[in-house]
Each structure stands twice: as C-alpha cells, then as structure tokens.
C-alpha cells in the first residue's frame, strides 16, 4: 500500500482554529515536522484543506502501524 509523506512548511499563527485541528489530526506539531500517513481519501481531504500549510508526496514506504499493533509486537517480543 502506498503512503504519503506530509511536511508542515508554514507555522500555524494566524490560521483558523479548524485548520489547526486538521494539522493536529495529521500528526504535525511544529514547522518542518514530517509524518508518513496511509494514502486514503480521508488523508487526502485533510491535506487539501490545509494545502497552503503543507507539502506532500507519495512514497513507496508502507505507512506506520497503529498503536495497538506496535504494543502487540512488543508484548510478543518480551515473551
């Protein structure tokens, strides 16, 4: 599955509160922070709404696993 790399290129000062919420939903906190997200219509819709704040590109790297999957793997490793 393809993934999308999103980078916050502008600060959030002066942005509407709704756009700040969307950026937080993408997992971006500070300027120049980067996240790799799954390529879904929901993600692309969020990116479209804040396109003036972010840059994005498709990458072949798989999207990171969810928190539950990581915890399950860690528990399996510990025995």
From Swiss-Prot:
This is Large ribosomal subunit protein uL30. It comes from Anaeromyxobacter sp. (strain Fw109-5). Keywords: Ribonucleoprotein, Ribosomal protein. Belongs to the universal ribosomal protein uL30 family. One of its GO terms (molecular function) is structural constituent of ribosome. Pfam families: Ribosomal_L30. The keyword Ribosomal protein applies. The gene is rpmD. GO terms for biological process: translation.
């Amino acid at each position: 599955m393809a993934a999308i790399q999103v980078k916050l290129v502008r600060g959030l000062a002066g942005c509407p509160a709704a756009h700040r919420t969307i950026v937080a939903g993408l997992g971006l906190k500070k300027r120049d922070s980067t996240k790799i997200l799954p390529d879904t219509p929901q993600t692309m819709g969020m990116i479209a709404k804040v396109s003036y704040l972010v840059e994005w590109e498709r990458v072949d790297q798989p999207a990171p696993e969810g928190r539950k999957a990581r915890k399950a793997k860690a528990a399996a490793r510990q025995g």
